[in-house]
Amino acid sequence: MAVRIKLKPGREKSLERRHPWVFSNGIHNVKGKPEAGETVDVVAHDGHWLGRGAWSPESQIQVRIWTFDREEEIDREFFKRRILRAQAGRDDLIREQGLTGYRLIAAESDGLPGITIDKYANVLVCQLLSMGADVWRDTIVDVLAELYPDCAIYERSDVDSRKKEGLASTMGLLHGTLPEMPVIIEENGIKIAVDVTKGHKTGFYLDQRDNRAMAARFVKGKSVLNCFCYTGTFGLYAANAGAASIENVDVSALALDTARLNMRVNGLNDDNVHYNEADVFKLLRQYRDEGKTFDVIVLDPPKFADNKSQLNGACRGYKDINMIALQLLNPGGVLLTFSCSGLMPADLFQKIVADAALDAKREIQFIERLSQASDHPIGSAFPEGFYLKGLVARVW
């Protein structure tokens, strides 16, 4: 008989709406002695069954629900079904955009809490961020090896959030032979170099794919400042779309080297591209003081808030950097600005940019609201899956 986790009165409502998390402060008692990662049944205070998930005793989220179907067992076939369903849901997108790099599993939003899997050509990269995901590692790898026999499988669970689960960071080859880095993926006819062993996250920001294409609409014959550029792919799309000049700015020399490589593998001349290894915050202030201006600016900063206590500081940071960027834009110019923090509500982010425009003494019009690419779905019961917010603003 499975271990049973009984909830406190009234704490069943979120699970009845199929939210997959059970917090420690919502648990009344535990019947049995579950091991970390063990499959447990969750019941309401009156005893009725709610879901089946993985036990994580050291986390504030003590159960992550695998299934809301009482008849569904958590075994190898369960993971195979989930992965096949996720792949089927992405097949149309892959054909439409010519993708060889995409997110295969988006954790809770694909019914596999704590599991992220990205496919980069013939390499699958896994992040296993929960105790349940970690315990099922060998099974997940076995299923992936069956379904994708030509792919190497590499783990990038080198993230601090595993500490909250009582897990150490880890990375390395799980199956097959890793090809020479970087691998080359394609999206929308653009080739992109990705190093899954050294790159950010799992190697690259697949979630910005649609927004890169959106940015290309505004750049023909324009001057473009691409801030926090990482491997320069907003600039790459801009070069392909005929931008007059591009400045890619990042603090990482390695990232900028990859940005140069991206231009070469696409056969693009980068005589009009400047690669600037610099602190974006300092550089924007310097350019403002020098009176330098641009037609298009992309702001894609790292996450400013990892927890709620950091949100106020993040708001100030977003306002400051957007204000300076707005001051650098020519009349009629375009700002594409992003927040990748799941804690930042979309409406609040828009208000911050609007307030930044007031401080910059610029009039702006919001012409697009942006989000993550559709291979990063948002489960209807899991609003936390909506993390990437973006705005396109015309500036006068």
Curated annotation (Swiss-Prot):
Role summary: Specifically methylates the cytosine at position 1962 (m5C1962) of 23S rRNA.
Catalytic activities: cytidine(1962) in 23S rRNA + S-adenosyl-L-methionine = 5-methylcytidine(1962) in 23S rRNA + S-adenosyl-L-homocysteine + H(+)
Underlying gene: rlmI
Molecular function via GO: RNA binding; rRNA (cytosine) methyltransferase activity
One cellular component (GO) term of this entry: cytoplasm
UniProtKB keywords: Cytoplasm, Methyltransferase, RNA-binding, rRNA processing, S-adenosyl-L-methionine, Transferase
Subcellular localization, as worded in the UniProt entry: Cytoplasm
InterPro entries to which the protein is assigned, alphabetical: PUA, PUA-like_sf, PUA_sf, RLMI, RlmI-like_PUA, SAM-dep_methyl-trfase, SAM-dependent_MTases_sf
PANTHER family documented for this protein: RIBOSOMAL RNA LARGE SUBUNIT METHYLTRANSFERASE, S-ADENOSYLMETHIONINE-DEPENDENT METHYLTRANSFERASE DOMAIN-CONTAINING PROTEIN
Classification via Pfam families: Methyltrans_SAM, PUA_3
Family from the record: Belongs to the methyltransferase superfamily. RlmI family.
Lineage: superkingdom: Bacteria
PUA domain segment(s): 2-79
Name of this chain's protein: Ribosomal RNA large subunit methyltransferase I
EC number per UniProt: 2.1.1.191
